[in-house]
Amino acid sequence: MYHYTESGLSNVYLKNGVTVEVVDGEEYTSIDDMNGLHSAIAQTIVNTNKPLAHDEFKFLRIELNVSQKMLANRFGVDEQTIARYEKGQTKIPRTTDAALRALYMESQEKNNPVSYFLDLLANTQAEEAAKIIRLEEVEDHWEKVER
């Protein structure tokens, strides 16, 4: 499996959909359907019933194509608060977590009420070890691989 660290996440592995070529002694990696892959990663993160990790928060913000400043304005906090969430210096409040998930789903036109995400997080404990996200390319799209 290819460890896809280029996403900014340490727990993403790709079963296929990756081509590695060596040209003039340099190794080049290409990934099929990058937009679809990032969408599959984001969907997996959004639908996971554990609080967002700092790197997942940043990944979703980048997928939304919004700056820290713009997201801070939406959430009514200062830009440094968003930066601290993304650096893991400050715990991400449950309501902020749910709101970011809802914003992402809205951007994909897959609207879920914020209460869905609050309920998803309500009775969970943050896991010590990061959950590994395994994806495979199936025909023309990426899917989560169940163990």
Positions of PLM-derived features:
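Conserved hydrophobic/aromatic packing and binding residues within compact polymer-binding modules
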Residues: 57, 71-72, 82-85
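Mixed-charge (Asp/Glu-Lys/Arg
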Residues: 105
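Recognition helix of helix-turn-helix/homeodomain-like DNA-binding domains
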Residues: 76-92
